[in-house]
Amino acid sequence: MKILYYIYQICIALPILLVLTILTAIVTIIGSLLGGAHFWGYYPGKIWSQLICLFLLIPVKIHGREKLHGKTSYIFGPNHQGSFDIFLIYGFIGRNFKWMMKKSLRKLPFVGKACESAGHIFVDRSGPKKVLETIRQAKDSLKDGVSLVVFPEGARTFTGHMGYFKKGAFQLADDLQLAVVPVTIDGSFEILPRTGKWIHRHRMILTIHDPIPPKGKGMENIKATMAEAYAAVESALPEKYKGMIKNEDQDR
């Protein structure tokens, strides 16, 4: 069965998805320029992500979406198991949001320009002024019910285990007094681990935990929220992936 699936993904699924990716990028760029990034920066990417899971025959299960309220803006903090985290969140979290992503992703053909047009936020750590500009852009995006998705680990896992959480997302939530929503991704590591070359068919599960409202302001609130979010995300992982293992490139 694995051999048949590999043949299917190479000969049928991947060519279709390549065309879909280019078309989605073009639609996002043109739509964002003409009609605003609020709609065009989210819905084409959402449909694209759902189609990727559909064509690759990947089942998806969602828990906890009912915990999100109305047009409230949140900062989502998921673990980062692999590349398919993007499709799971974009396609199935059910909230209009902006990504906070590495600056290097801007260089990706079509996709980088589409992300820029959609208003997603590229993190530039080249100097204090660039960091402040990134924070300002993030603050500006969090309006009209739009949320922000940040991977607190900052890098995909090599092992399936979570690394430590960096404080950036939690500091932003503290500054804006927004709730942090811990999100657990399970199954993405089995589909395409960081060092993997082939896509493996496996179910993905997205678990949305209770929002963590601010309990004050300052470093004490930041540390408490980080600890609570980490425990929540880890709680929905399989036993084999529980326990922190630092990623070798997390400090970059």
Regions flagged by a language model, labelled:
Residues 4-7, 132-252:
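Non-catalytic C-terminal accessory region of glycerolipid acyltransferases
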